[in-house]
Amino acid sequence: MSLSNKLTLDKLDVKGKRVVMRVDFNVPMKNNQITNNQRIKAAVPSIKYCLDSGAKSVVLMSHLGRPDGVPMPDKYSLQPVAVELKSLLGKDVLFLKDCVGPEVEKACADPAAGSVILLENLRFHVEEEGKGKDASGNKVKAEPTKIEAFRASLSKLGDVYVNDAFGTAHRAHSSMVGVNLPKKAGGFLMKKELNYFAKALESPERPFLAILGGAKVADKIQLISNMLDKVNEMIIGGGMAFTFLKVLNNMEIGTSLFDEEGSKIVKDLMSKADKNGVKITLPVDFVTADKFDENAKTGQATVASGIPAGWMGLDCGPESSKKYAEAVARAKQIVWNGPVGVFEWEAFARGTKALMDEVVKATSRGCITIIGGGDTATCCAKWNTEDKVSHVSTGGGASLELLEGKVLPGVDALSSV
């Protein structure tokens, strides 16, 4: 899945035109303060390019959180983003209190030249995702005629459409696939993301190592299976390693994560690895806890000793870190998706931090290192390594689906060239 046959912003004529742009401003917030502005910064090049190329206006639309189709301005308003964007662009940003309807259409019909307008959260309308919940929390589906009206209103806000929301590219939502304008182009962030993943997956440097962490095997089956066709080596860490170790080594895992559904496929995945000559590295030792708590009592365990009843593994131990470091040292290209421990808690962060240090070291010797978004991107922000690896993806789910070999609807919907 690459952008090679899709229209991109650098080939789109925006002079004198109103540009309606889908961006991903779904940023983490605490008490209405933005805690990480990576996604806002990532959209700035596309916005600036439009303004510098003489666009009449740039109308920005995004979601934030999961309001499920119910307006929740106190909790999920994009207003703080408008303030942040103003300081990043160094120019005024007009914030509108809705994203569709006559008032919004009027404000966007003939704005002053060079205007930047940010619409309120798309997901305050159930028609964006097509489904949501009502005020009492019951599931509701959007009516087809209302979805059509919602999409028609968004389509009136610009003359050309740009999609720079890689983080939502795996969702067939109204703002991603339903804006009906003659020219639909991918923005610079979309282009950068897809180029990185296309090169990584279609013509990788070798040896190619995948580091896969996270909790559930079942969620990652497609990922593991697809990557086994592409890589030379794979580290399987994090919570899902326990399912592998219990099945393969009959290891006692205490109350560590065990994925019943995923456990049935472990042997198939291992025989595929064997057939493809992929070297698999699993953890050999662990930092354990007597409960799932930041301040739990901690202990140590190995695969051989097992984890005692009532205890759980929440991080890998020093011997595992050594094995991981050896695999990283052999690699010329690394794709990393999912942490190898509960990195949010200091007592269980050491394994992921040690691995991050090795990946940074590998990058400095010329290895191509790609961090799939989500939790692993959060690790980069936490340890300040965003500019010490080759690429940190802004899309967790979207990068995961690319690595699984899927077509992204948001990219599919762009104009072909």
Swiss-Prot record:
Residue numbers carrying N6-(2-hydroxyisobutyryl)lysine: K97, K216, K220, K323
Location(s), subcellular: Cytoplasm, Cytosol; Mitochondrion matrix
GO annotation (BP), single: canonical glycolysis
Residues modified as Phosphotyrosine: Y76, Y196
Binding site residues for ATP: A215, K220, G239, G313, E344, D375, T376
N6-acetyllysine: residues bearing it: K11, K48, K75, K86, K91, K97, K131, K146, K199, K267, K291, K361
Highest rank taxon of the organism: Eukaryota
Annotated positions of the N-acetylserine modification: S2
Modified residues (N6-malonyllysine): K131
Reactions the enzyme catalyzes: (2R)-3-phosphoglycerate + ATP = (2R)-3-phospho-glyceroyl phosphate + ADP; L-seryl-[protein] + ATP = O-phospho-L-seryl-[protein] + ADP + H(+)
Any Pfam family matching the protein: PGK
The protein's name in its UniProt record: Phosphoglycerate kinase 1
Organism: Bos taurus (Bovine)
Lineage, uppermost ranks: Eukaryota, Metazoa, Chordata, Craniata, Vertebrata
Name of the gene encoding the protein in the UniProt record: PGK1
